Amino acid sequence: MSACQTPLIVALDFPTRDAALKLADQLDPALCRVKVGKELFTSSASGIVESLCAKGFEVFLDLKFHDIPNTTAMAVKAAAEMGVWMVNVHCSGGLRMMSACREVLAKRSGPQPLLIGVTVLTSMEREDLAGIGLDIEPQEQVLRLAALAEKAGMDGLVCSALEAPALKAAHPSLQLVTPGIRPAGSAQDDQRRILTPRQALDAGSDYLVIGRPISQAADPAQALAAVVAEIRS
């Protein structure tokens, strides 16, 4: 497997295996990792992960597991056995759920995936949280969940880059994975709390997830190269 030399993760947000692999064939695994989400995994099952790994990519399995502790832990274990590089769970599942995931990984031999907690989805704003009974700012809820994640021994968090400075200050050991990244001039789409790649890295993000600006570009390889140039400038 080629070691990726950048913090970039390209989201393979496609409905079919063929479409995802068509994009992957245009990308360099030395310049990016790839993310497999719910739609693609549901349509393609574990075979898509195997195919991407065979092409040299490190895979972030973005299924945001959230269930009772044992069920979630077994799902995380299954993901590890597929050979994924990163897997995530919802921090809102609680301390016992996250701790169970950490423990099940510690008991297995071989490479360990990064275990990442999802705090507040980047599409959510204060009014969205209020609608589910949380009358607080997203940043406050992120910090609450981050404290639980660190206590459970998680490797990092998915968060908006706008939350990254506060998270790095409070929890410097946690690696921060930031979606909602848009190169300068890109449309915001359905991600609300966004920054450019350079801004996100400067804010403290460790990994950057980029989707449509690369996946829907006329030339995805060129679009990826432009983002790499931006973060290296």
Curated annotation (Swiss-Prot):
Pathway: Pyrimidine metabolism; UMP biosynthesis via de novo pathway; UMP from orotate: step 2/2. It comes from the Bacteria. GO terms for cellular component: cytosol. It catalyses: orotidine 5'-phosphate + H(+) = UMP + CO2. Belongs to the OMP decarboxylase family. Type 1 subfamily. Catalyzes the decarboxylation of orotidine 5'-monophosphate (OMP) to uridine 5'-monophosphate (UMP). This is Orotidine 5'-phosphate decarboxylase. It comes from Pseudomonas putida (strain W619). The gene is pyrF.
